[in-house]
Structure formats: C-alpha cells, structure tokens
Amino acid sequence: MAPRLVLASQSPRRRELLAQLGLALEIRPADTDERVLPGEPPRDYVLRVAREKARAVPGDLVLAADTAVVLGGEVLGKPRDADDARRMLRALSGTRHEVLTAVCVRRNASALGVELDAVVATEVAFARLGDAEIDWYVGTGEPLDKAGAYAIQGSGGAFVEEVRGSVSNVVGLPLAETAALLRRAGFPLPWERP
C-alpha cells in the first residue's frame, strides 16, 4: 500500500491541482519563515523555502512547494496590503516576468530517507494596466493572498497575454514535474496502481 501523501501547504490552489491527479491528501501546513534572505537569488529562495516546508512537517511522504513571481530579479511575494498589491500590479503592467515554483518531495521510507526537488520557471506576459483596472482588481480581494498579486486562474487571467511554460506552475504547482518527483520517490500515481 502506498504511503499517505501529506501536503505541507494551506494553499487551496495546490490542493485543487493535486486533486486533478486523483490524489488523496492529508493537509498539514508548514510553519516556516518565507522572507527572502539578503542577496538570495530567486531560484535559491523558492528552493530553500520548499525544502524547509517539507522538512518541517512529519510524514512518510511529504510534498511542499513555494511559488514566487520574479520581475527584474526582484521576488514579488504575497502583497502586505491593498497598496502593496497596487504597487506590484503597476510594476507588472506591460512586462514579461517569471514565475518560479520549487517542489520538494521528502520520503522517510528508509533509514536515510529521500529528498527530491525541482524548480520550474514559466514566463508570463502581462497586459498594460491602467489605474481603473488595477483599482477594480484589488477591490475584488483576489490579489491579496497571491504571489505577485494576481491569480491566472481567476479574474487576473484577463491581464495575462501570453504564457510560455507550465500554466499550472503559475497557479502554484507544476503538475507534470510534481508527478515525476512523486514517481521518483516511489509513490505510484492513481493510474499506475493495481
């Protein structure tokens, strides 16, 4: 019997994406410090946070992830408030930016355990936004708990002109890469089980 998969996240988006793969989950959010360290490159940042989340939660098979929007080398995390969301959306307006997600799978099936990870990058082209669009969008409340202050799977998708790479990565979890990591960790996916 396959071990129960523990998701070290409170993200409803990650839960929904994993449900698309037919995976039953136990949700145990990790309590970790998600601040960017001084001088920390964006790839190193998301990988460090995903690993810390996976290590902070007990379980035989733990999956954790961290997503960041990166513009000009700056990590845009979740906005502190509505004004910060407006600032981020103005900065993203009319630009191409990168969405990075690090996924970490930790398995404690042996004395040594196994930790596998991957970082996936997706390029997103954003429409030019005026103040009226930004104010309306911030007023919906949707951007306030999203990295980079937008949700491609929600109303914010209206501002996305082009995506190069994994769309599920922009939502918060690259499904193809996550499935590959689970397989490598010895976790059979629903269609691989007898």
Curated annotation (Swiss-Prot):
Query: Which residues are listed under the site Important for substrate specificity?
Result: 13, 67, 153
User: Where found?
Assistant: Cytoplasm
Q: Which GO terms describe its cellular component?
A: cytoplasm
Enumerate the UniProt keywords alphabetically. Answer: Cytoplasm, Hydrolase, Nucleotide metabolism
Keyword Aminoacyl-tRNA synthetase assigned to the entry: answer is: no
- Name any cofactors this protein relies on: a divalent metal cation
Q: Which domain of life is it from?
A: Bacteria
The identity of this protein, by name, is dTTP/UTP pyrophosphatase
Q: Which residues span the membrane?
A: none
Q: Which Gene3D superfamilies match?
A: 3.90.950.10
- What are the positions of the active site? 66
